[in-house]
Amino acid sequence: MSSSRVLVTGASGYVGGRLVPALLESGVRVRCLVRTPAKLAAAPWVDQVDVVQGSVGDDLTTAMSGVDVAVYLVHSIGAGSDWVEQELRDAQNFAEAAQAAGVGRIVYLGGLGAGDETLSRHLQSRQNVGAALASTNVATVEIRAGVIIGSGSASFEMLRYLAEVLPVMVTPKWVSTKCQPIAIANIVSILVAAITTDAAISGVYEAGGPEVITYANMMETYAECAGLRRRILIPVPFLTPRLSSHWIGLVTPVPVPLAKELVNSLVNEVIVTGRDASSAFGVTPTPLHTAISRALDVTQRGAIPTTFFDADLVHFRATELDPAWAGGTVFSDQRRLTSALPPDEIFAELATIGGEKGWYAGELLWKVRGFLDQLIGGPGMRRGRKAELNVGDALDFWRIEAVERPTTLRLRAEMRLPGDAWLTWQLTPRDGGTLITQTAEYRPRGLLGRLYWAVVWPFHGFIFPVMLKRIVRAATPRS
């Protein structure tokens, strides 16, 4: 099916935003059905797809025309009081439109969970949607998954913020419920295989990772991967899903309605008990520790301009289409200044920073910070610098990560920190001169990391604007 046309709904969502580029890479033609096409404007692949404006509840004649496989990734969780009924109506409309258009296959990503009366409203709705999509004579493949691991996934972001912010947690009973988390890269691979296979397939497949664990185990694994101290979990049996969803809304940026449905779903065991999707579609499940480590790795890479991404890692990072709170917490201090000088003359001055030259502002504060770093085993300011700036070289207590003359200098902190920090300068030609953008970025690790930023932030207000002004002032025109 490499030359087939595939309709993807939910392309601006978490899974859809990762599935579309994978499908394009496999050689299929992609059409995206979106209510608001402007939401796809930031996607790097938008020019390679056919975009149709509309909703799954609308007339889908145009969207379905000439389509071989229709992918259903829409989920209206918490969208109004009648969202369960609306989901069912939309799915039925989609299935009937697919049948009328002669679509060969529907592929749907649903939710794991034993189909009985104990299922949460969220999971029951997911499975009812699957049944509605399969109600016509169009072959329907339903991939059921539980917790998906990757930056941008609501489940993963909830896990991330809970583990990062709270070293001690009072926990409800649902943290002891069994689940089978799966890496986003595995989900994308399974979906691509289900969409592109030439085999006649249909029915329900269940997707899970190699480990069956509890949510508490996941938090412990996250803490280990993130270099945090072991989380202390104190069981409190009377903490209901309703109360815990409001608590999650308080300590994480995940919206309360979404947190409520996610928590309600965690009351149910979400493990593979039926036909295994990974085996059926030839996908090797990624271990949880590896999946979390990759998600954390690309979270850090996301702050670093780079041209390299492992073909697997790319699925784990937060994308332009994800919510603003996806990808973890990043604190930043950004300053801009313009100069009549061209970029090469500004960069020539910038390239002298550090070592004996110093840091242009707050020299005593830099030295005190270096001294404190040495006291706790860090490199301090004693390493100095080489005459030329080269990627990988030390620069006081920084490491040079990127040098692109005359536009970019990026430094990564190697001082002892409860997090990761970068200092970047971008030089952009502007009206015959230069726009200089100086950005300090900090990704905190745990509660201590957040407290650290609160302590040093007032000093940034003094040091960074003066530093930028003095760099620009010190630059001299070339004769």
Task: Annotate each predicted stretch with a short phrase.
Residues 11, 19, 26, 116-228, ...:
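Oxidoreductase cofactor-interface core, primarily capturing Rossmann-like NAD(P)-dependent enzymes
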Residues 2-28:
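N-terminal Rossmann NAD(P)H-binding glycine-rich loop of SDR-like oxidoreductase domains
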Residues 9, 33, 73, 106-111, ...:
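SDR active-site strand-loop-helix element
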Residues 194-261, 269-335:
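Mid/C-terminal beta-alpha module of Rossmann-like enzyme folds, strongest
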Residues 413-461:
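Beta-strand/loop substructures that line and gate deep hydrophobic ligand-binding cavities in soluble
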Residues 330-331, 338-347, 351-418, 470:
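Glycine-rich portal/gate segments that line the openings of hydrophobic small-molecule binding cavities
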Residues 28-35:
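Conserved glycine-rich Rossmann-like NAD(P)H-binding loop of the short-chain dehydrogenase/reductase
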Residues 38-101, 111-118:
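NAD(P)H-binding glycine-rich loop region in Rossmannoid oxidoreductase-like domains
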